[in-house]
């Protein structure tokens, strides 16, 4: 994981606003959105709609944060990583460019 200078750290509320914005675009509504330190993952999505993001994401570039956010939000529609999931992920991220 890369470290950004302290002045580049995104505030937690800004990050959560990014999650809400992407959720509206994708058409999903997470039950809960949390940030906490995680040792081995960038994020996780529970079967009950709880999204948990690694606090280290706050130090990452916006494009990478978007990839992780979209990935987890899409799990609210598609619970696996098969072809339909990957196609949706590519389509959503292509909207960003």
Functional labels for PLM-detected ranges:
Residues 1-67, 76-97:
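Active-site-proximal or metal-binding-adjacent scaffold patches in catalytic folds
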Residues 72:
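Walker B catalytic acidic pair
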